[in-house]
Amino acid sequence: DGGGDGQTTNIQNKGSDTMLQLAQAWSEMYAKKNPDVRVAVSGGGSGTGIAGIINGVVDIANCSRAMKPGEAEKAKEAHGVEASQFIMGLDCLAVYVHKDNPLEKITIEQLGQIFGEDGTITKWSQLGVDPPEGKDEIVRLSRQSNSGTYVYFKETVIPEGKSFKPGSLDMHGSKEVVELTAKTPGAIGYSGMGYATDEVKMLLVAKKDGDKAFAPNNENALSGDYPIARPLFMYTLGKPKPHVKAYIDWCLSPEGQKVVEATGYVPAPKK
């Protein structure tokens, strides 16, 4: 903390890589409005943010998954208070392919067959499309296991009790998945819809064969029609301190929620 009259209040905000762009945008805008408050934002994954709360070194953990019962228990044991949960917005996990891939839509089951350990889909021709640039082999891009995105995709797409098929390229962050997909004609990967570029295509996703396939967008995420959308959370230890609460309240205000939309996420459902 700075000395003298120009006292700066620091808020340590760590966690989800999915939320990193959003958290940085919030922090910058808040600093302009409140020059005496500095929100220090870092990534590292949802699990890292929660570990930071449990260890008492982080004020706010950003999470793209809900806190696990074991984590909540640890936080309570360490500090004697329950963690508080705030829903800050929604993230639509898009399924990305190369922009020249002729495939337009996919089902949850097909994704499980591509990414799951018992899955039998390994070639684009099995999905009824001519392989992009003659590259028929499907190149799977995934995330590391400390990522909330990895956990959520696994729970949603891969049959219960099963793991990811080995041999995927596991990327550090959301952005890297999209960047490598853009350079790899045979690639398929998953990442927040906010990371889309002109170099990739987002597939429509259907819950099951014969169902209507929906695009990843705000409307379909809020209605529940798009099957791979999830809440984005902030967690604090116990009730947040006044300066931390003021920040979270601002992030949830109409002004803060505009930032959510501007960074490609879905504003939090109205209470």
Task: List PLM regions with ranges.
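Exported/periplasmic ABC-transporter solute-binding proteins
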Residues: 1-91, 96-271
